Structure formats: C-alpha cells, structure tokens
Amino acid sequence: MSRENVELVKRLYDAWEKDGFGVVPALMDPDIEYVNPQYAVEPGPRRGYEGFAIAAEAVRAVYPTRRFEPLAFYDARDRVAVRVRVVARGVGSSVEVDAERGYVFDVRDGKVVRFAWFNEPDEALKAVGLEE
C-alpha cells in the first residue's frame, strides 16, 4: 500500500500545480488536519477542509507568487515525507525566497488525513522515522 501512498501524494502535487495550493477533496479526507510547527507564526493544527483552506489562504496572502517543486518522496508506510523546493515572493517584496522544506503526509484509506510542514527537510524525515 505504501507505494500507492507516494503516488497519491504525487497526484496531490499535480493538482496543486494545476489549480493552486488548497483543498483537493478527491485526495483529502474531510477531517484532514493541517499542522503548523511550533515555530510557525500561527502554530498548531487546523482541521477539516475549512481549516486547511484557511491555512492555505494564509500562505497565499503572504506569498501570492509561489511554487512548490517536490525533489524527493520518501515512503514510510502510511506516511510520505517530501523534500520540497519552495520558490516564493512575499507581498510587496522584490526578494525571492528559494529554500528547501520538508512536508509529511499521513494517508489512510486512500486519502490524505494529515499534512505537516517543517522548515528543514530533515525534520520531516525524522518525523516519519527516516533519518537521512
């Protein structure tokens, strides 16, 4: 099943590339949890499609121009860690942010049930028990 989970997460990135970062009901559980790390401006979880949509809108508001480029997918059974290149420009800024981040997707019954992000890709690997 874990290979299918990686493919599911890849389809989610394809949807985000096409339609923008946000809720994708076909690939996400209605009770999805979006988790900001403790060092985030607004730490903690957001729940459901509405919570995910609010968190995604906050990202779009700060970084109206952004691109997520998955660099590597790590299979961890019912979890998938992703090393991602984020290229973004903040509101009113001419400075481009170009950094690698780590994301973790928890999958159950063919849907993403939890999404968590980390400033450092190694944090995501550690979170799923795969230290690089």
Question: Where is each model-derived feature located?
Answer:
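C-terminal and inter-domain tail/linker signature
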Residues: 1-132
